[in-house]
Curated annotation (Swiss-Prot):
Binding site for [2Fe-2S] cluster: C39, C44, C47, C77
All residue ranges annotated as the 2Fe-2S ferredoxin-type domain in the record: 3-93
Co-factor binding comment: Binds 1 [2Fe-2S] cluster.
Protein family per UniProt: Belongs to the 2Fe2S plant-type ferredoxin family.
Organism field: Raphanus sativus
Protein name: Ferredoxin, leaf L-A
């Protein structure tokens, strides 16, 4: 399946199409959207965003705890869309 992923970035909103087997960070990059990242392995917080609406599968990540996930935090480098989803990017500093 292909879903619409909307990124709310400091520069404004941008929407991409993302297959359900593509990480949302990769889909953003392919569309020329510059998002923060570091490890690309789901084991740090550089790429952290927050899900505003919709859902993702981020079972590949190993950094966020259950409370952070419940609050909506997402590691974009290790998240597949499972519906149309809106994500606020650049939210690493909000996780502390």
């Amino acid at each position: 399946a292909t879903y619409k992923v909307k990124f709310i970035t400091p520069e404004g909103e941008q929407e991409v199409e993302c297959d359900d087997d593509v990480y949302v960070l990769d889909a953003a990059e392919e569309a020329g959207i510059d998002l923060p990242y570091s490890c690309r392995a789901g084991s740090c917080s550089s790429c952290a965003g927050k899900v505003v609406s919709g859902s993702v599968d981020q079972s590949d990540q190993s950094f966020l705890d259950d409370d952070q996930i419940a609050e909506g935090f997402v590691l974009t480098c290790a998240a597949y869309p499972t519906s149309d989803v809106t994500i606020e990017t650049h939210r690493e500093e909000d996780m502390v």
